[in-house]
Amino acid sequence: MAREFSRTRRIGQQLQQELAFVLQRDMKDPRIGMVTVNDVDVSRDLSHAKVYVTFFEEDPQVIEAKLAALNTAAPYARTLVAGRMKLRVMPELRFIYDASLVEGMRMSNLVSKVIRDDEAKKGHIGDEPQEGQREED
């Protein structure tokens, strides 16, 4: 019977927490700035980990530069996290930009805009006199 949470998933969750802490407190690279660790996907043999991150930037060039800086600093981040976690093998980190949060916010804004437009149209249509009604001056 399979466990509800596999070992790789538990390690991924702990790695996510430790990376978030290390990136906020210990990494002093100004090129990285504010970064959010959304998820960590660890391979079954614990040799590699994909770290999904987002930034508070929307410019694709800035995002690419920050992602490149993170991937350059990945060995240092790996060393810092290895000191905080008790693992025999520390996965090699690979940072990947996660656009799902930004895309979700964009979709939410679109839905809100459509709802506002519909309500405005209903209000505008309701203001017009219908057949059989007269406007009073």
From Swiss-Prot:
Residue ranges crossing the lipid bilayer per the database entry: none
Cellular localization per UniProt: Cytoplasm
Coiled coil: none
SUPFAM superfamilies: Ribosome-binding factor A, RbfA (SSF89919)
Keyword terms of this UniProt record: Cytoplasm, Ribosome biogenesis
GO MF term (any one): ribosomal small subunit binding
Biological process (GO), any one: maturation of SSU-rRNA
GO cellular component terms listed in the entry, alphabetical order: cytosol
Keyword presence, Hydrolase: no
Signal peptide boundaries: none
Pfam (any one): RBFA
Principal cellular location given in the protein's record: cytoplasm
Quaternary state and interactors: Monomer. Binds 30S ribosomal subunits, but not 50S ribosomal subunits or 70S ribosomes.
Family designation: Belongs to the RbfA family.
Function field: One of several proteins that assist in the late maturation steps of the functional core of the 30S ribosomal subunit. Associates with free 30S ribosomal subunits (but not with 30S subunits that are part of 70S ribosomes or polysomes). Required for efficient processing of 16S rRNA. May interact with the 5'-terminal helix region of 16S rRNA.
UniProt-recorded name of the protein: Ribosome-binding factor A
